[in-house]
Amino acid sequence: MIGQKNNINTIIQWRCNKSVPRFIIISGDVGSGRLTFAKVIIKMINAKGIIMGNSIAEVRETIENAYTITEPTCYIFRNADDMKNESKNALLKVVEESPNNAYFIMTVQNIDNILGTIKSRGTVIKMEPYTREELLSTTNDEVLLKYCSNVGQTMEDVENIKNAEYLVDEVFQAFRDKSGTKLLKACTNLRGKQTETDKCDCTLFMRVLRKNILSLDTGLLQSIDIYHISRCMQEISRNTINNKASIECMLINILEDIKNAEIS
């Protein structure tokens, strides 16, 4: 596995001390290697790994199986940001006091999307940022290296990134012109449905916007409440949210900040 030296050292210590947690939450962006890291843990504890779904039926099936297995088994719940509360509450009962041979791993993009009661019973591992040197082992493309923070992201099509750059430039120009019309026109190029493959992926747009936001004029930057961006990032980490609508709302709020700053 590329990178993650501190996290690897942590699980080595767990193994040496015979203190591997029964419930682990791995937090990190898409492409950061959460599932790969989970497989490293499973191999370290010499357990059988099973990827489960997040529905209440599959959670209940997992619980039932966990009490009957006779060999070490690790159940993985992937992308649990959107796991419904009834599933989380059912899972809570078994992770509080795990059966003898059962381990549980949950992967999320944003740890804040997890119920506090779930989080308090798990051991949280946050995927570490990848250095430029580590990313160079997968690509030497400067565009990818500028916008990619993990190995998975380096698989992105460079043309998609360039299109996202162009769209971000249009948004920034709308901010400079204080034009809601131009802003909404730019937003029509955001992907609202999976079938709109000719439009810009919302997650990629946010990545490029965050990377370039400091290029805005100082006056504009000072009037922007960064909360709008952080809130949008949290929202789009949940698949149940309309990402395009969330970004549109964020951009409109930022434009209002800019206009209000001018008035004051």
Where on the chain are the PLM-derived regions?
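Conserved phosphate-coordination/catalytic loops
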Residues: 2-5, 53-57
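Conserved ASCE/P-loop NTPase catalytic core
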Residues: 21-42, 60-77, 82
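Charged, glycine-rich active-site and insertion segments that engage polyanionic ligands
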Residues: 1-38, 43-46, 100-101, 109-208, ...
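Conserved alpha-helical scaffold flanking the Walker A/P-loop in AAA+ ATPase domains
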Residues: 9-15, 55-76, 82, 86-94
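Conserved catalytic segments around the Walker B and adjacent sensor/switch elements
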Residues: 45-54
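Conserved catalytic/switch belt of AAA+ P-loop NTPases
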Residues: 67, 86-109, 116
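Short gly/ser-rich anion-binding loops that grip negatively charged ligand groups
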Residues: 52, 77, 104, 195
